[in-house]
A protein has these predicted regions:
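Catalytic domains of carbohydrate-active enzymes, especially glycoside hydrolases
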Residues: 270-290
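Short, well-ordered beta-strand segments enriched in hydrophobic/aromatic residues
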Residues: 42, 52-54, 90-94, 612-615, ...
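Catalytic and substrate-binding clefts that recognize carbohydrates or anionic sugar/phosphate headgroups
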Residues: 83-249, 259-260, 265, 272-277, ...
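Catalytic core of carbohydrate-active enzymes
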Residues: 433-438, 443-444, 451-461, 484-494, ...
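Conserved, mostly hydrophobic/aromatic
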Residues: 42, 94, 183, 275, ...
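A low-complexity, Ser/Thr/Gly/Pro-enriched, surface-exposed linker/loop concept
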Residues: 43-90, 125-129
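C-terminal motif of bacterial Sec signal peptides marking the signal peptidase cleavage site
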Residues: 21-22
């Protein structure tokens, strides 16, 4: 009897242990909590990603909702389930998610320390009007309560001089120069993606709530991302959710010459020839609109304009001069094009006013799968003809004089107000998927004026639209790019010098415009894509601003040459972006989250892990209009984040972090600093990226701390990298030993250099050259 009781006690003791073990086995976990008004569904997608969907009782839940941006499916995950009378808590190895049973509000905490990350503070559902095309659906809203002094970033490209979102009110409705992505993240290392492609609003009330609202939805739908607080890990979570970035060809990272527009084959080829004759490095030249002829033939995707001789001569000339051709395409068509006729026949043209305003041009409906196939059928001809990159302009798209009737209009996927912000994702998806299905050997390259969360998976990057040539606009581009790329999309650029510049009397002879152009060019060395562009009739090839020997020409040329010198570093950043979900433009929160001053800065950032950039965004030589000031230099102050020692890139001076650093700069320099421990591979002097092999690279080491860098190489184009055909070499600096270790080469690819020399240049020491055969070697200069 006593033995039986003892055995029973043992069995009862084991039951909770067995139950705990069972519930902690990896599985897809989805829990539902109902209050007296709403249903709250929580789905664990992975240890670092949790989805929260809420809807009125009896409404539409997660299983019935379409997502354009999210590609991740729920993964089997170890989850601990804890339930009390007040709350249900799901805990992964990264986070704990607690649902209040009375209110349905969710609190997110760090799993390791239990620290609260973010708490919800109200969900609302306002029925759409009964006579509305979206009747039966809701205006949906979710509020949170971040800490009062917490920094928030993201929402895409806002054209705002402030990087932080605190105190901001933002209407999320894409338009030229504004790319709105409903994602925000915190200095704490968490991110929130609000999955609604329709008209939305973000509002952060100082000292109060942070609110996301969408005009149309069946439910609130958000993804909470958190991987222990590390910002690089958060970036990996974003790419896991929205898709991996693709590898762009090596040439994309060189210099692009673009203008609105080249008017003929002869004009474009002459510009390219002049670059080559003057020794101005260049990898891509761009043909803007109207190569198709008149507006009635808008975007025919053919060289119908007789001044282009069907395009074959131009394309051959570009390729024979070791350059690449990008060409403008649009999401709308003139009535004389075959695309217009086919799209009209299937009801896939949107009745909106768009650009061009004349000629009867109409936008196509990319939400219609058949329309996407028609679009590609005609675009394919340009690709087959040899065009290297597609410039997808106006992908918001342009929509002039919008009306309520326009917002009510039903696309193939729903009303315009409910889906419009997914337009750029869907149209670029159609191009990319068809491109890959055709089996082209060259990597896809798409530059698009608008974007959505996850668009990086379609070989796409954006630029900041038709910005004006003004100093305050240049200043706003810096946080615009940083808030955009922190949303998971690594590539971005601007029109160097600005697009609209008609207000500068004398054009490129105006010293004020020259100074702005030079400073914009110097900054763009440290932007993922370096592309010069302007509006007509002005032409801004760098030789338009002066002759060799004159400052406006020389400083632009020096900037372009520096870009090419940095190419091994830049292409290695590209490799890390794909292989490790890295970032090229890094807001200071990525590396200095504990430095409160660094978190508040909007005009400094890291280019890769090692280079801090502080662009000059105010005039010195001129008054910003036309008059020369007589000043040839000026003092600028840069805050250098704490926790690192820094080198002035230009002088080699060593500066401790945590302080402001002030010095005088001429027109030849902008403030650029290198972190101690950095290892920078420098390439040869070239006219285009593939001109010379990287058979003798300089490895610059900035001592003062241990350092690491991975040199990445592949064939420069093609998709073999997806099959593992690439090589990496780890470079490690041991500060105590004063030794650089060049590790064993990992991987290979056709055409790879089997041997090379490295010139190791440790600052302050005599350089030394080592021969490398793919095996580990050390250098102690």
């Amino acid at each position: 009897m006593d033995q039986s009781l003892t055995n029973m006690k043992k069995l009862l003791f084991l039951i909770p242990v067995v139950l705990l073990a069972a519930c902690s086995q990896p599985k897809v976990v989805r829990e539902t909590v109902e209050t007296d008004q709403i249903t709250c569904e929580v789905t664990v997608y992975s240890p670092d990603i949790v989805r929260v969907v809420k809807y009125p009782l009896g409404g539409v839940g997660a299983s019935q909702k379409k997502s354009y941006s999210v590609v991740l499916e729920p993964q089997k995950t170890k989850v601990k389930r804890t339930e009390t009378a007040e709350a249900l808590t799901l805990t992964t190895e990264k986070m704990a998610v607690s649902i209040d049973k009375a209110t349905g509000q969710v609190t997110f905490c760090d799993a390791a320390g239990g620290k609260q990350l973010l708490q919800e503070n109200g969900t609302s559902f306002e029925p759409r009007p009964a006579d509305d095309p979206d009747a039966g659906r809701f205006k949906v809203s979710q509020a949170w309560t971040p800490e009062a002094d917490e920094f928030l970033y993201g929402l895409g490209q806002r054209q705002d001089p402030d990087l932080s979102l605190r105190g901001k009110k933002v209407h999320l409705w894409n338009e030229n120069m504004h790319i709105y992505i409903p994602f925000f993240c915190s200095e704490k290392g968490y991110g929130v993606y609000w999955d609604n492609p329709g008209m939305s609003d973000f509002e952060d009330v100082p000292g109060g709530k942070t609110v996301m609202t969408s005009e149309v939805g069946d439910c609130t739908d958000l993804y909470f991302l958190y991987d222990g607080g590390d910002m690089d890990a958060l970036m990996a979570s974003e790419r896991k959710l929205g898709g991996k970035a693709t590898m762009f060809p090596l040439w994309v990272h060189g210099y692009w010459q673009c203008r609105e527009r080249y008017h003929s084959t002869e004009e474009l080829c002459e510009a390219l020839r002049t670059h080559r004759e003057m020794g101005i490095p260049l990898d891509c030249i761009v043909q803007d609109w109207q190569y198709w002829g008149e507006n009635e033939n808008w975007n025919s995707m053919r060289f119908d304009n007789p001044l282009y001789e069907r395009g074959d001569t131009m394309i051959a000339n570009v390729h024979n001069n070791h350059a690449h051709l990008a060409i403008s395409i649009w999401p709308d068509f003139g009535p004389l094009t075959p695309q217009f006729k086919e799209l009209e026949a299937i009801g896939a043209l949107l009745p909106f006013k768009t650009w061009s305003m004349t000629g009867g041009v109409k936008i196509y409906d990319p939400f219609n799968a058949q329309a996407r196939e028609i679009y590609w059928k005609y675009l394919e001809g340009l690709v087959d003809q040899g065009v290297d990159a597609l410039w997808s302009d106006s992908t918001e798209p342009d929509h002039f004089y919008p009306t309520k009737e326009d917002d009510d209009y039903r696309t193939a996927d729903g009303t315009w107000r409910s889906v419009r912000n997914a337009f750029p994702l869907v149209t670029n998806m159609g191009i990319y998927e068809n491109y890959r299905a055709k089996g082209y050997t060259k990597r896809a390259v798409q530059m698009t004026r608008s974007a959505s969360f996850g668009i990086q998976r379609y070989a796409t990057f954006s630029w900041s639209g038709d910005v004006q040539s003004r100093w305050e606009v240049l200043r706003a581009q810096i946080p615009s790019g940083l808030d955009y790329t922190i949303c998971g999309i690594p590539y971005w650029n601007t029109d160097i010098g600005g697009f609209f510049n008609w207000f500068y009397e004398g054009g490129t002879d105006n010293d004020a415009l020259k100074e702005l152009q030079v400073r914009w060019m110097q900054w763009s060395v440290f932007v993922p894509v370096m592309r010069n562009h302007t509006s007509g009739p002005l032409t801004t090839e760098i030789y338009r601003f002066g002759k060799p020997g004159e400052w406006a020409f020389d400083e632009q040329l020096n900037a372009i040459k520096l870009r090419y010198k940095l190419m091994p570093y830049i292409y290695s950043l590209a490799g890390a972006t794909v292989l490790e979900d890295g970032m090229i433009m890094r807001p200071l929160v990525m590396d200095f989250a504990k430095d409160r001053k660094a978190l508040s800065l909007s005009d400094e950032y890291l280019f890769g892990p090692s280079i801090l950039v502080h662009p000059v965004t105010e005039p010195v030589l001129t008054d910003g209009k036309a008059a020369l000031t007589g000043k040839m230099e000026a003092s600028f102050t840069t805050y250098l984040p704490a926790g690192a020692t820094w080198y002035d890139f230009h002088t080699g001076e060593i500066v401790e972090g945590g302080y402001d650093y002030t010095r005088t700069y001429t027109i030849s320099e902008i403030p650029v600093f290198v972190k101690a421990g950095a290892i920078l591979p420098f390439g040869p002097d070239v006219q285009y990226t593939s001109e010379k092999p990287w058979d003798n690279l300089e490895i610059a080491v900035y001592p003062g701390a241990d350092g690491h860098f991975t040199l990445y190489e592949d064939a420069g184009d093609g998709y073999e990298y997806e099959k593992g055909e690439y090589a990496t070499i780890d470079l490690d600096w041991d500060e105590a030993q004063g030794c650089l270790t060049i590790g064993d080469r990992k991987g290979s690819f056709p055409g790879m250099l089997r041997e090379r020399d490295f010139t190791v240049n440790v600052l302050g020491r005599t350089p030394m050259t080592v021969h490398y055969t793919g095996k580990r070697v050390q250098a102690k200069p």
